[in-house]
Amino acid sequence: MAELSGEQVRRFFEKVIPARLRGGVPIVPVVRLTGVIGFSTPLRPGITISGVARLLERAFSYKHAKAVALIVNSPGGSPVQSHLVYRRIRQLADEKKLPVIVFIEDVGASGGYMIACAGDEILCDVSSIVGSIGVVGATFGFDKAIGKLGIERRVYTSGKRKVMLDPF
């Protein structure tokens, strides 16, 4: 005897039982987005558009869904991947005319927060770390102090921009 998948069972009941008799329990597909955004391997999973596109499309394809829920737990990572995931969520939400509700677990920072901003509503615990979109590079300039002390520094690179954040 063949075993039926959850999707096959759901489709069967949709065909056999009229919608008005099915109970009225709202369907809200959930997509979990966890980890660093960007490059991933089997041993180090991460969030990339190629890794989550099918999950998002599947969540937005539920026939009677009232909304799509995203669970975000990410410190951020690649700005490009963050934006691609954000954009795909908004495209699907607009196309399917479904609201997106985002739940931030422990952290939704940097690119994780950017993805969360694709939601129509963001919910989190009071202890969750939320916010901070942007790339920051901090450095100090000691060139005058080094010159006064007579220190000479030599750096050899294959291009000028490779040391543009060098504080010396």
Protein language model features and the residues they cover:
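Small-residue-centered hinge/linker elements
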Residues: 1-98, 110-168
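Glycine-rich beta-to-alpha transition loops that act as phosphate-gripper elements at the mouths
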Residues: 102-109
